């Protein structure tokens, strides 16, 4: 049984992070955006060269790799899953970006930048549970971002009603 950040349980029959690692094995981007939309988003950011970027719940660090390649930023990625952080490290190393992207295996809600209000971009895409909810995410990221910097928060949403059995399995069943 795994427990999500909301305290709900999922009877996975295995470690929760291993389960998510398996279900996301073939995903380059592990959030509610496709690779193409992620590339488009990075192109819209207009980050300063050498800027400071943070991505909380960075998954396989694809967003950070794209930002580092496009803008030569210095980036930090935070990921709680021991399986996903290893995939992120491989992605960063394979692309020759280890000198610009630092990856931390930790709870993103516990992260504190070296200086408050110092980041050019603070992002958390598809994982607002890290900071309890969407408002908590915006508040936490804003405190880390310099005046005039960018805060990027994304939420997954259902385009159609999910199967009740899925909601029951994930512990998100409102009943």
Map each language-model feature to its residues.
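Conserved class I S-adenosyl-L-methionine
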Residues: 5-48, 50-57, 62
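A structural alpha-helix within SAM-dependent methyltransferase catalytic domains
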Residues: 42, 65-68, 138-142
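Class I SAM-dependent methyltransferase SAM/SAH-binding core
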Residues: 62-110
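A short acidic, Gly/Pro-enriched loop at the edge of an enzyme's catalytic core
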Residues: 113-122
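Residues lining the SAM
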Residues: 124-128
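A short glycine-rich, Lys/Arg-flanked "PGG" loop and its adjoining helix->strand segment in the class I
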Residues: 135-150
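Short, glycine-/aromatic-enriched active-site segment of Class I SAM-dependent methyltransferases
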Residues: 156-174
């Amino acid at each position: 049984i795994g427990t999500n950040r909301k305290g709900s349980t999922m009877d996975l029959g295995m470690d929760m992070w291993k389960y998510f690692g398996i279900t996301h094995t073939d995903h380059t981007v592990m959030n509610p955006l496709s690779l193409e939309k992620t590339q488009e988003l990075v192109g819209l950011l207009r980050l300063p060269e050498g800027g400071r970027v943070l991505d909380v719940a960075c998954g396989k660090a694809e967003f950070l790799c794209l930002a580092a390649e496009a803008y030569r930023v210095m980036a930090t990625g935070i990921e709680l899953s021991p399986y996903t952080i290893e995939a992120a490290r491989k992605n960063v190393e394979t692309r020759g970006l280890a000198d610009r992207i630092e990856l931390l295996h930790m709870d993103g809600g516990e992260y504190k930048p070296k200086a408050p209000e110092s980041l050019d971009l603070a992002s958390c895409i598809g994982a607002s549970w890290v900071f309890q909810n969407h408002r908590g995410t915006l508040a936490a990221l804003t405190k880390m971002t310099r005046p005039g910097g960018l805060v990027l928060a994304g939420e997954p949403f259902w385009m159609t009603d999910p199967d009740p059995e899925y909601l029951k399995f994930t512990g998100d069943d409102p009943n």
